[in-house]
């Protein structure tokens, strides 16, 4: 599939800046093809690793039903959204990624993914603490992996101009 070019390409973030937004972010919105043709967009925590995003969820529900029906998804993270009332605008920075999601099946890949997520959100935990948390939540846990096919980052033109002025 060909992905659309961003219309305002002067506002395009570099690949490094785009990856940095995903590495820094703590939550985003996962958009899926939902029931009866309605989009289903759900806020979710994640971890970014290379060209993959990892999410956790329960072993059943709307999200998994949608993914099983159609594994294509988009994921959006807003890094900055500073409202500037006197200019009738916002100074924003965001990323959108498109890709395909799969449920991680084997215990090994599921475990590797949940450990990445745990290290992101609880970086100072002990190995024993992380192990206890993973074991406690293991039975109902489903891990998802989104392989990114295309992603772009964009920022407000005012931020682009400010960078050039430095």
Locate the predicted segments by residue.
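Extreme N-terminal tail/first-helix region
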Residues: 1-24
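Short solvent-exposed loop/turn micro-motifs enriched in small/polar/acidic residues
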Residues: 23-25, 38-39, 88, 139
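Short beta-strand segments
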Residues: 25-59, 75-76
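Structural motif corresponding to alpha-helix initiation and N-cap regions
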Residues: 15, 60-61
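A generic structural signal for nonpolar/aromatic side chains embedded in well-ordered alpha-helices
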Residues: 21-22, 66-67, 117, 146
